[in-house]
Amino acid sequence: MVALLCSASLCGDISVGDACLVSNIKAKCRDNLVTGGLKFHALKIGSRKKHWRRKSMRCSVVSMKSSDFSGSMIRKSSKPDLSSSEEVTRGLKSFPDTDSSFSYFKSVAGNLNLVHTTETCNYMLEALRVDGKLEEMAYVFDLMQKRIIKRDTNTYLTIFKSLSVKGGLKQAPYALRKMREFGFVLNAYSYNGLIHLLLKSRFCTEAMEVYRRMILEGFRPSLQTYSSLMVGLGKRRDIDSVMGLLKEMETLGLKPNVYTFTICIRVLGRAGKINEAYEILKRMDDEGCGPDVVTYTVLIDALCTARKLDCAKEVFEKMKTGRHKPDRVTYITLLDRFSDNRDLDSVKQFWSEMEKDGHVPDVVTFTILVDALCKAGNFGEAFDTLDVMRDQGILPNLHTYNTLICGLLRVHRLDDALELFGNMESLGVKPTAYTYIVFIDYYGKSGDSVSALETFEKMKTKGIAPNIVACNASLYSLAKAGRDREAKQIFYGLKDIGLVPDSVTYNMMMKCYSKVGEIDEAIKLLSEMMENGCEPDVIVVNSLINTLYKADRVDEAWKMFMRMKEMKLKPTVVTYNTLLAGLGKNGKIQEAIELFEGMVQKGCPPNTITFNTLFDCLCKNDEVTLALKMLFKMMDMGCVPDVFTYNTIIFGLVKNGQVKEAMCFFHQMKKLVYPDFVTLCTLLPGVVKASLIEDAYKIITNFLYNCADQPANLFWEDLIGSILAEAGIDNAVSFSERLVANGICRDGDSILVPIIRYSCKHNNVSGARTLFEKFTKDLGVQPKLPTYNLLIGGLLEADMIEIAQDVFLQVKSTGCIPDVATYNFLLDAYGKSGKIDELFELYKEMSTHECEANTITHNIVISGLVKAGNVDDALDLYYDLMSDRDFSPTACTYGPLIDGLSKSGRLYEAKQLFEGMLDYGCRPNCAIYNILINGFGKAGEADAACALFKRMVKEGVRPDLKTYSVLVDCLCMVGRVDEGLHYFKELKESGLNPDVVCYNLIINGLGKSHRLEEALVLFNEMKTSRGITPDLYTYNSLILNLGIAGMVEEAGKIYNEIQRAGLEPNVFTFNALIRGYSLSGKPEHAYAVYQTMVTGGFSPNTGTYEQLPNRA
């Protein structure tokens, strides 16, 4: 092969024609022209005429093989070409095979005027990797080390790929072992560089492993490497490792500098180890490495973070009097940190000092001042500060306005924040995604997911592309509200706007799925998260384990726990606490103890919550003795029991019947932890149940004596409620009487309320009335209106209307003014019992006593009128109320009216009223649709009923069991059994469980249509698959339809099954059997059934005689 070698530095005379003549030698070969290290194809010389005319060149023709490149063949240049890297790369790419490229690579390496770069070396490494040439790759890597060519991430990743090491840079510690085996031996510079690359990628653990290997191989890391490692470990709060590195560097003869010491102070300070930070500061002085202004600023920052504000001020004063004067960063740090601690006075003091020292306030410092004023609640001064800024020629920037908006939202001044937000553009500042995020976050945390989503959409319409933080903030609000549909739209729309979900995104979506019960979707998302290279954090997995346990998917929860190792996650104390709680809930004591012991062995020390969870498991499963043993172990392990610990063990002792032991434990508890309200509610019910009234009395009096304030009424209500639930009415009343009689409870009414409630709930309304009289008359308790209402409600529930009226009169006679709830109780009772006159009389009384009726009152009256058959009167009242603008109808207003009209055959009016609901801001609910569907169904208008069903689904109203039952019934009534069966299947597929009524309707419909095999299949399904016990209607329906179809033997079997089920047949049962036998031409069987019926004490009706053969 012939190549033309030219050098611009070697001047000679050559014409373009001569050059072209020379270039034609062996034109069929691949000729190369190298000019000052730049390569051109010989056939392209003509295109560079202008360049060649400017320069005279000396050239020589050299005959050689394509692989025979040597350094001597490339003429020396007096001046290296700065663009050589790009040209060398082009040269490497021009060769048809890797061997030629590698030869050219080595020849360039031998030329002193040409310099290989990271780009050329990486290209060569990749080309060699593709051909599997590891030895040559090792040569390239060694050259990079010797020539000190930067080894970047791509360098190492290419080598890792060639060695089949998967997992990226994170696998560096493992890859280094393989690299050495294949000749890639790192020097000190490479080790330092690799550690920096790992730290830059936040692989701190892996960086430390590489550091350890570096030390083992006898290399000494640089001071910069130690500093970088310390910074990385400091971010992870790994103080021991940071301080360990400080010692190690000294053993290797490296002397820490001011930067290294400052890093240590920052790490110690942020971890709250202020004394240790001061020791480092003292050591700096002792070793002649005096702290600089950065060191002092870092120390001030640490002291402020640890809330040691006085110490921070002392350091500041020391700086002022010393040689290291505070700089602008020092003042910004002081202003910012004291602002965070809401110390406005100090902020103003530092501001004054800053100005005295000649540091002119700028937009950054002014923004900090605005933040401090907002945190102090001085919003007027904060807004005035904006004017001061403008007067000084400093325009508030976006961060200033965002700070002010955040301050306003922090104190829930939403309207002011929105006003400022609306004025930003007129003030010359355009809101960014962050501004919108602030509002989205506020709405989300306030539970207003609608406004959060509207703000997110508004941001997009303004042309601001949402970032991942905005999406995550929106997802937070939607997840909190369980609005999975909108959350999915945002999540799956991320790709459309060029965003990639991060760990927070996935966490929010999994939370949302968990909230709506879509656990499988959450698990799928976890897999997707890992596939997309987004590593799940332990919080996400803990949440998922907890969700699975709550859904009783215990096995899957444990599988998720086992997968944590595969996900390279270390279980935390929260993980173990969740699993322990689950085991305790399922009564698996042994497994809980084993898990507890396992977590200790695996280096995850239990905390107080862990022990409390374990105690809860043991005490609920009658293992209180073991819990007491574990309590001693808890204290030995340095865990301090809290009030929850003692409450749990007291619960266990009381549950186990060890009331006296519980009392002793309670007295021991007081020496360490003061009991709380829960303690009393746990202990006293057991003490009272054991009839230890005197002991219970002493415990409560002692507790109240040590209380600073008298307990609220709710305290007594909850306490007596707990005692009633455990000890029963008699002992609870004895204890309560003692408390009231001795004035321990100053407001006896708060004790009377739970007693009345308990008695009424247990259907002992007369007893409630008696106790009410005893406490009010004998013990002098003055009942309040809520107590009267409770008693009146209980009496009316038990249909004791007259006594309730007496109590109502008593209310008025004692000076208590009945409220709307009192009247509503009585009005509802009158309406349900058909006492319309009394209802209207009381309704009028309300207005004369200035007790304003509410919507519930009006609804009760309307409902009462409808039930009494006075639909028109009810409509008149409705229209009168609608003329009053203060009345807002509800679904309970329309329900009785639509029902009354439907049952009266006035379906057109019912539909008209239904259509008018939305005009008054009342959206029809499922119950309203059910009433109307039932009305049309009963009238035989199945199409209208089906249309209403489709409409309710379209409008987002979820049908319930009643809806499907009504629809199935009306379709079967008109013979459209297939459609009825369709909706019955849809009912089951929707997750609803059909009841016996629904099964009866479809079985009867199939039977009437002579589809008896299908009817029997559903009959068996309800018994076996669904566990629903058929009632007499089910059996009667089957007997009747089987008999009509001539299947009298099967009908007889169903009759026998009635007897086995323990049900008593009625006249309709016998009539159905008689009819079946009569139609089948078996009169003797028909008369036999008739005889059985009469001898069984059943009275035949006209239907019986009509079915007997002699009447045929």
Curated annotation (Swiss-Prot):
Effect of mutating residue 505 to I: In pgr3-2; Affects the accumulation of the petL polycistronic RNA
Main location: plastid
Keyword terms of this UniProt record: Chloroplast, Plastid, Repeat, Transit peptide
Pfam families: PPR, PPR_1, PPR_2, PPR_3, PPR_long
Keyword Chloroplast in annotation: yes
Subcellular location: Plastid, Chloroplast
GO BP annotations listed: plastid translation; RNA stabilization; translation
Transit peptide feature range: 1-62
UniProt GO molecular function: mRNA binding
Listed GO CC annotations: chloroplast
InterPro entries: Pentatricopeptide_rpt, PROP1-like_PPR_dom, TPR-like_helical_dom_sf
PPR repeats, residue ranges: 117-151, 152-186, 187-221, 222-256, 257-291, 292-326, 327-361, 362-396, 397-431, 432-466, 467-501, 502-536, 537-571, 572-606, 607-641, 642-672, 676-711, 712-746, 748-783, 784-818, 819-853, 854-889, 890-924, 925-959, 960-994, 995-1030, 1031-1065, 1066-1100
Purpose: Plays a role in the stabilization of the primary polycistronic transcript of the petL operon encoding subunits of the cytochrome b6-f complex.
Family, similarity comment: Belongs to the PPR family. P subfamily.
Protein name as it appears in the record: Pentatricopeptide repeat-containing protein At4g31850, chloroplastic
